[in-house]
From Swiss-Prot:
SUPFAM superfamilies documented for this protein: Positive stranded ssRNA viruses
GO terms for cellular component: host multivesicular body; T=pseudo3 icosahedral viral capsid
Family as reported in the entry's similarity comment: Belongs to the picornaviridae polyprotein family.
Record site feature (Cleavage), residues: 1-2, 269-270, 340-341
Region (Involved in P1-2A pentamerization): 270-340
Name by which UniProt lists this protein: Genome polyprotein
Record site feature (Important for VP1 folding and capsid assembly), residues: 273
InterPro entries, per the entry: Hepatitis_A_VP1-2A, Viral_coat
Keyword vocabulary terms for this entry: Capsid protein, Host endosome, Host-virus interaction, T=pseudo3 icosahedral capsid protein, Viral attachment to host cell, Virion, Virus entry into host cell
Feature: compositional bias, Polar residues: 8-20
Any one biological process term the GO annotation gives: virion attachment to host cell
Record Pfam families: HAV_VP
Amino acid sequence: QVGDDSGGFSTTVSTEQNVPDPQVGIKGKANRGKMDVSGVQAPVGAITTIEDPVLAKKVPETFPELKPGESRHTSDHMSIYKFMGRSHFLCTFTFNSNNKEYTFPITLSSTSNPPHGLPSTLRWFFNLFQLYRGPLDLTIIITGATDVDGMAWFTPVGLAVDTPWVEKASALSIDYKTALGAVRFNTRRTGNIQIRLPWYSYLYAVSGALDGLGDKTDSTFGLVSIQIANYNHSDEYLSFSCYLSVTEQSEFYFPRAPLNSNAMLSTESMMSRIAAGDLESSVDDPRSEEDRRFESHIECRKPYKELRLEVGKQRLKYAQEELSNEVLPPPRKMKGLFSQS
């Protein structure tokens, strides 16, 4: 039976448990709670177990059944908008003092290495095509138990902005930030923020295939700034992690070769590449008999070729049967020694 360890064999590592101590002999004040004191009991109606009492009364059930032919899973995993519509890691930074701001540009160029350049999936994706046009979704995850007032805003390329990649006091006025569309938040009330960065550029599109860093080239989408206030670094920890994703309005133009194509595996034997699984075969896989018959019926040049071959086989078969079953004349009777006269 499953889970029966009577035979002395178990797939799980046995852990030696502490012997129950009915006399409440726990040593140390830090390891002693109110429930460990003798005579103290839980209040009437209080739940002392982790399990939810509501779930214990529910009838076990599975997903609702659907009619045959009705699809339950409707997400298209081959769609670029589905895959890149999920948030992918962009950057992270930590504040060390109060009343500071941090600005980072969203540069699509592949020549800039992290942390100033796109990392991982984003770097690979934005080099699969020449030009990008459209808005982007920015997700900001806040880490740390703090009660800090914050403000985030997006600055298009070419407008006034604080020094990127440096934690410093902002030199911009509050009126200027508000005109750009600032978003205010409090870290005690929210742990994540999602902002749709607009497509606001004097260019028709930006490219990840160009060199450059910052806002001096045609590869920068824009700059994002985050400012904080009421932050005490001595007893608090505040960190921001940013993630980027495309939107349904994103447009990708002119596919190109993947990044780092010179790192692809090279060999003189094509069969070894196919055997290694990194190269598709140039011919189709062996088809089933049903597929072969179906394709033979829709062949337009000689639609009755297979039929004529099959008829020829049957004619040869019948001819062989006729030869083997041909009626021969009865044998002649011979007079021998034992024949009666």
